[in-house]
Amino acid sequence: MTVLTAAEPPNRIEVDMDAPSLDTDSSCTSLSSSVQRYEYKHGRRYHGYHAGSYPFPNDKREQDRLDMIHHVYTRILNDRLFLAPLDPRGKAILDIGTGTGIWALHMGDAHPAARLIVGNDLSPIQPSWAPANVRFVVDDVEKDWVDRHPYDFIHCRYMAGSIKDWPRLIRQCYAHLRPGGWLELQESVNVMYSEDGTLPPDSFMARMMHGLIVACEKSGRTMDPAPSMEKWVQEAGFDPITKHRFKIPVGSWPKDPRLKECGSLMRVNFVEGVEAFTASLFTEVLGWTPEEVAVLNTGVREEAMRNDIHAIFDFVVIVAQKPY
């Protein structure tokens, strides 16, 4: 078993002392009716196909947030869509939980010589237009896969809180890869921290993340798969395995321009996305009242706008090959 650890990120993210805090006011073509049916609750739209499998909304506001997160993750990877040592030409590629389809669409644009790029998701929210080598499928990846064709590359990103049985999913990835094919898992470690003590453990942001982890565990889904991904791919038989770790700040406080850009977008993610995170899980699973959730959401938004709080997520990428 060959496990490689890529270069770690810098020890500390340097703070831009001149960065101001901000005020919260400033900133398939044929689908069955069951797939197209949606649920509406908490003032938001949720998927109806296998309802409850994904605890977050799928409406336009959420789609915009997901596209923003795609940009953050791509920038953190130095404008790369993937880290696997793969030449996409002539290859069949699968994007698990494609969401809006933005990763698959960008792959199709960037690699027109790729033979096929498939994006699957529970929600049919992908655009009807796409590059010629891209197609979208509505499917539940936790069930037996309908598509029996082998892939050369499987990409799975930002699926925290969505999967009940990660080891089974990874075994299915292994089974549907050609020998020599690659699996890439990208997830943030959903425990926030600061390197300078500016994020207290009882902060609203830390409490929200802890609540999400507890609620997902009660629902039978893990909100923090990143720490276990390396073990799961080892157990599935992948070899070699490379682990990359990056830092994602929340806020515009970093000096580094790229991290400042990513942090500014992550601030928007919290300010505008906190309602999507908490609406269903905190009321339906944790039993909070709407008033209690509203207080938490307000606290999260206010903390996210402060540049004297230097919150960070770690971002983990696992690149694993199926042996020949």
UniProtKB/Swiss-Prot annotation:
Q: Which Gene3D superfamilies match?
A: Vaccinia Virus protein VP39 (3.40.50.150)
Q: Key word Aminoacyl-tRNA synthetase present in the record?
A: no
| Pathway(s) served | Secondary metabolite biosynthesis
Q: Which GO terms describe its molecular function?
A: methyltransferase activity
Give, as one word, the top-level EC class.
Answer: transferase
The name this protein carries in UniProt is Methyltransferase pytC
Gene name on record?
A: pytC
Kindly list the biological process annotations in GO that this record carries. Answer: methylation
InterPro entries, A to Z: SAM-dependent_MTases_sf (IPR029063)
UniProtKB keywords: Methyltransferase, S-adenosyl-L-methionine, Transferase
Record family assignment = Belongs to the methyltransferase superfamily. LaeA methyltransferase family.
Identify the EC number(s). 2.1.1.-
Q: What induces it?
A: Expression is positively regulated by the cluster-specific transcription factor pytR.
Point out the coiled-coil segments of this chain. Answer: none
The consequence of inactivating this gene is: Abolishes the production of most pyranterreones, but accumulates pyranterreone 5.
Q: What is the organism field in this record?
A: Aspergillus terreus (strain NIH 2624 / FGSC A1156)
Give a short account of what the protein does. Methyltransferase; part of the gene cluster that mediates the biosynthesis of pyranterreones, a family of antioxidative compounds. The first step of pyranonigrins biosynthesis is performed by the hybrid PKS-NRPS synthetase pytA that condenses 4 malonyl-CoA units ato the acetyl starter unit by the modular PKS of pytA. The acyl chain is then connected to an L-serine through the amide bond by the modular NRPS of pytA. A tetramic acid is formed and released from the PKS-NRPS pytA to give pyranterreone 5 with the help of the thioesterase pytI.
Keyword presence, Protease: no
